[in-house]
Amino acid sequence: HETRNLAKDVTFANTLKTMRNALYQNLEKTFDVALLPEGLLHDLASQHNLTPADLARDKSLYSIKKLRSASDILLDPNGGGERVANMLRAELPAQRYWAALACLYLGKEVTHNHEEALSSLLKDPSRSVQIAAAEVLATFPINKLGANAALEVLLANADPTISSAYHAVAALNALDHQPQQILEPYKQRIARLPTNDPDVPGRPNGYAARMHKHIASPVPDYFSWEKPGR
């Protein structure tokens, strides 16, 4: 069996929008924080001295309507246009995060059109935004210098003693998404990184260590029976 991704199939565009609307309505009703990456969720809760549950009820910090303006960009078959540019510079870090992910989803041309704005996000106050922008620029680099700068941002955030257990896993995942020929020269540096965040108890502190094992013994980019670029 083979899974067929219908997300970009124009035949199902209206169905996809209907399903997303239902999802957003459910998020509103249940105060679900699914539109926040985990690292950003914990950062915002800590900065404002709120529990995640209270954060979900604070419209100034977590407005699903505002976040939709960024998270829905990836549905635009024309590449988002000015919406991407505006959201990459938006006030809410989650909007900037979703705008960066839209570039990753929409591909090389869209990424290159917004390379300057994405590069500025490598120094964003939010580590979640840094990581998202870095993955985009590492995946669709303008040049080798830009790719290396993006990878260095991911490596810095992959240290949980500098970022957090949550950001470290996000950065390690972004590194793991890179082709093995790109990742191979960095594997020894990754292996030397700490795996524990002294400020995070319990289960989250196991995530980075498991990612280290996966990166050290990866699934190949392509199996022998597959064609590259499939």
Sequence positions of predicted segments:
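Generic structural motif recognizing short loop/turn segments at the entrances and edges of beta-strands
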Residues: 1-2, 31
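Short His/Asp/Glu-rich catalytic/ion-coordination signatures at enzyme active sites or charged loops
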Residues: 2-8
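Long, internal low-complexity/basic segments
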Residues: 8-230
